[in-house]
């Protein structure tokens, strides 16, 4: 990998572990629960986070194993499985897998010669479409070796309930260094102890958690109602407009888009195809600036342009496509 990457620390010693705060919650949030259970009802909507890295050469296998083991100490969520409460009464609970095995989650394969980058992408596609074993921590990684030019490919797949995109970047950062030599005395944490949590136990934890949160929720509700009432007396029109604005925002979130969307994507299957289009960040920034937009604007415009050409190739004309935009809620 290039040594100029500003997102990769010089070594693991330079990692600020206090910044790796995700994965601390014992219980899934409502959003994470939705992502976890959605694929059971609609498998076509599976959306794992898949990161594909192209390496100039294959890393030492034992060092890679050690790096992932170390990362599982720093981020305990890596060692955790999701336990559904009895009858799904509540949100799933994260529990340390008593049978956690790095060798199950991290594998390697050597492609038969001749092998180019497209052959490696086919392996990535297979990994991306395999459903997770929900009795284990929902992530997997694969080192693909044997490319004709000496390069290697490292692909990591994580379930969206584990973390968001920013958390995924943090996790990948933990596995990298700009120094080729091993890092001694890097900061470490004691791995969490294995647990044997059952669905009944998960339900019990949910009940206890809700009881503990109830007083604070009631207090917040009372304070909120008092503040709204006071504001309504002093500025009734402002309060009414804020309430209506909130209601409209909520309606936009929970109401499905009015448009039918793409006829080509409506009945899509479980298969996926991977391809690459290389564009340098400086070139993309220059194009965005020329059009009066941001880097993100240019990226989204390129995606929509690709969808437009895809539909044209199949003789379909679509004026608009509903899309979801992930937004980082981190502070």
Give the location of each predicted region:
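Soluble acyl-CoA-dependent acyltransferase catalytic core bearing the H(X)4D motif
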Residues: 2-33, 41, 48-331
């Amino acid at each position: 990998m290039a040594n100029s990457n500003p997102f990769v620390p010089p070594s693991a010693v330079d990692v600020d572990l206090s910044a790796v705060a995700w994965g601390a919650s014992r219980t899934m949030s409502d959003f994470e629960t939705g992502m976890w259970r959605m694929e059971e009802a609609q498998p076509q909507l599976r959306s794992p986070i898949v990161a594909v890295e192209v390496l100039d050469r294959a890393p030492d296998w034992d060092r890679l194993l050690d790096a992932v083991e170390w990362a599982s100490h720093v981020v305990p969520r890596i060692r955790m499985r999701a336990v559904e409460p009895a009858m799904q009464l509540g949100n799933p609970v994260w529990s340390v897998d008593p049978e956690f095995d790095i060798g199950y989650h991290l594998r390697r394969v050597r492609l038969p010669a001749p092998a180019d980058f497209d052959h490696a992408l086919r392996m990535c596609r297979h990994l991306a479409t395999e459903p997770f074993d929900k009795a284990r921590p929902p992530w997997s990684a694969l080192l693909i070796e044997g490319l004709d030019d000496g390069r290697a490919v490292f692909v990591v797949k994580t379930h969206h309930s584990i973390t968001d995109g920013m958390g995924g970047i943090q996790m990948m950062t933990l596995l990298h260094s700009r120094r080729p030599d091993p890092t001694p005395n890097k900061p470490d944490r004691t791995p969490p102890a294995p647990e044997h949590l059952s669905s009944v136990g998960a339900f019990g934890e949910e009940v206890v958690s809700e009881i503990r949160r109830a007083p604070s929720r009631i207090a917040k509700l009372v304070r909120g109602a008092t503040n709204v009432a006071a504001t309504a007396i002093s500025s009734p029109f402002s309060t009414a407009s804020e309430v209506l604005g909130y209601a409209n925002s909520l309606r936009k979130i929970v109401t499905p888009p009015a448009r039918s969307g793409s006829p080509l994507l409506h009945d899509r299957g479980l298969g996926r195809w991977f391809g690459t289009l290389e564009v340098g960040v400086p070139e993309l920034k220059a194009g965005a600036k020329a059009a009066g937009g941001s880097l993100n604007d240019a990226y989204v415009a390129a995606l929509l342009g690709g969808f437009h050409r895809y539909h044209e190739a199949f003789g379909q004309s679509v004026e608009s496509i509903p899309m979801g935009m992930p937004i980082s809620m981190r502070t």
